[in-house]
Amino acid sequence: MQLFHLCLIISCTCPTVQASKLCLGWLWGMDIDPYKEFGATVELLSFLPSDFFPSVRDLLDTASALYREALESPEHCSPHHTALRETILCWGELMTLATWVGNNLEDPASRDLVVNYVNTNMGLKIRQLLWFHISCLTFGRETVLEYLVSFGVWIRTPPAYRPPNAPILSTLPETTVVRRRDRGRSPRRRTPSPRRRRSQSPRRRRSQSRESQC
């Protein structure tokens, strides 16, 4: 795989520093953490099993359906949009290079080795990155980080002492919103106070009842 890595370094044309670090460093196995600037780590993502992440094609379709306009815009929308855009570009470069290497290798065993390596190792890293940034844009970064921590605690807890089902990302925003709402709830009450209820004298209430009877 050293030849494949060398070709990746030479052919990668991603324009930003982040994409260059992703293609030339992180995918190559160097000690670079592309999640650090977003408050997460590679180790935190590693708690999620490989079959947890959808396929690259499904993730690309999801990103296009939800954020196509922002991804195609030359303007900077958010760090997650930029990271997602450059990850997609890097995956395209990787596929182009893998196709070229596969077509120029005469040995079928070597071609299969390249394809399996890309799909198993680099493909998983791309799936993790795509899922992370799409989820942060959809649910919010804090919610995703809370989910990763919750899942990490759940998966490391012995089965006898943990709930049978793993945490679900889509349910966290509801509990998070409720918890924050409870913290910041004002002391105002919608129901009338006892003082207001006692402000009406019995005579006033009797006059109202007589008027209602008329």
Swiss-Prot record:
Q: Which GO terms describe its molecular function?
A: DNA binding; RNA binding; structural molecule activity
**Modifications after synthesis and translation:** Phosphorylated. Cleaved by host furin.
SUPFAM superfamilies for the chain: Hepatitis B viral capsid (hbcag)
The record's section on Pfam families has: Hep_core_N, Hepatitis_core
Chief location category: secreted
GO biological-process terms attached to the record:
microtubule-dependent intracellular transport of viral material towards nucleus; symbiont entry into host cell; viral penetration into host nucleus
Record's subcellular location: Secreted; Host nucleus
Query: Signal peptide span per the entry?
Result: 1-19
The record's region (3 X 8 AA repeats of S-P-R-R-R-R-S-Q) falls at: 186-208
Provide the residue ranges of the propeptide in this protein: 186-214
A GO CC term assigned to this protein in UniProt: host cell nucleus
Annotated segments matching region Disordered? 165-214
Q: Where is this site: Cleavage?
A: R185, S186
Q: What are the Basic residues biased-composition ranges?
A: 178-207
Q: Does the keyword Secreted apply?
A: yes
What are the protein's UniProt keywords?
A: Disulfide bond, Host nucleus, Host-virus interaction, Repeat, Secreted, Signal, Viral immunoevasion
Cited Gene3D superfamilies: Viral capsid, core domain supefamily, Hepatitis B virus
Q: Repeat sequence: residue ranges? A: 186-192, 193-200, 201-208
In residue numbers, the region (HBEAG) covers: 25-27
| Subunit annotation | Homodimerizes.
What family does this chain come from, according to its entry?
A: Belongs to the orthohepadnavirus precore antigen family.
Described purpose of this protein according to its UniProt entry: May regulate immune response to the intracellular capsid in acting as a T-cell tolerogen, by having an immunoregulatory effect which prevents destruction of infected cells by cytotoxic T-cells. This immune regulation may predispose to chronicity during perinatal infections and prevent severe liver injury during adult infections.
Name this polypeptide is given: External core antigen
Which organism is this entry from? Hepatitis B virus genotype A1 subtype adw2 (isolate South Africa/84/2001) (HBV-A)
Protein encoded by which gene: C
